[in-house]
Amino acid sequence: MPLVVFCGLPYSGKSRRAEELRVALAAEGRAVYVVDDAAVLGAEDPAVYGDSAREKALRGALRASVERRLSRHDVVILDSLNYIKGFRYELYCLARAARTPLCLVYCVRPGGPIAGPQVAGANENPGRNVSVSWRPRAEEDGRAQAAGSSVLRELHTADSVVNGSAQADVPKELEREESGAAESPALVTPDSEKSAKHGSGAFYSPELLEALTLRFEAPDSRNRWDRPLFTLVGLEEPLPLAGIRSALFENRAPPPHQSTQSQPLASGSFLHQLDQVTSQVLAGLMEAQKSAVPGDLLTLPGTTEHLRFTRPLTMAELSRLRRQFISYTKMHPNNENLPQLANMFLQYLSQSLH
């Protein structure tokens, strides 16, 4: 059955959404398999995305795991970053080869894919929504007071600009607040990040998050491998179960590509007769052109049609055309065409030589 690919940066709620979808589909009696980084690595390790060789091996393991599970009867959910469009195209090719539909669920953190933790009270005033560093409080150590002062100064500057008056100096009330900034929490982590950290237990360093953001290739519904596309911003937005069900169980599977299909096998007798008939036609043509003049109609063995003679032909040229005809005919074998092989080859020669 279908393939569901989750895509998004860390802390965007992918795992929670994947579990929500798994529970909803399992409640309908469907067999659902979830493939994620932890299932492949044994435990989620964010450091993999900092090493190109290990990340490439991880993508190969994820693709192999999906390919093993993918069938017309089970639903496979891939819960990973999947931020490279080339990898998403490979997954699309797997679904197309298995003749099963797929859809893409793109999870985005509120405030944009690179927004960091927000300042306390930022939701109450849009002008105070100031993004700060991804660096956790535990790594700040003695710099907590300086960080709090910087945040408060940015807050005051943002409020001043919103109110239409930019002030150069910090008021005394703000200075008194800065002195106690280290004692009161200055940063509040969004609910989506809390749930993501609680669910996975993995920590992505600020440098790694920045690198992933720069490498991230956002899905585009104009690409056939990125549609149908469902975009979810935050955890408050409900999961579009009706649309996902329609995409997975009502849509037709992507049409198979001709290069991925097995060509029909030709029987041994067909190939033997094809080789014999074309050889006889060439031998008859070489013999007939010895006494022919341009404009004559040549009658060749095994044919009911005629070939107009226009110029002398070499054996090398005729052999090349014979190989081309045999290669094409082997790809489309049909035992019903056996009596017409000589006429078909004669028509091919006539079109190729004139």
Swiss-Prot record:
Keywords: ATP-binding, Nucleotide-binding, Phosphoprotein. GO terms for biological process: tRNA wobble uridine modification. The keyword Nucleotide-binding applies. GO terms for molecular function: ATP binding. Pfam families: KTI12. The modification Phosphoserine is found at S184, S200. Residues 116-149, 162-199 are annotated as: Disordered. Belongs to the KTI12 family. This is Protein KTI12 homolog. It comes from Homo sapiens. The lineage of its organism: Eukaryota, Metazoa, Chordata, Craniata, Vertebrata.
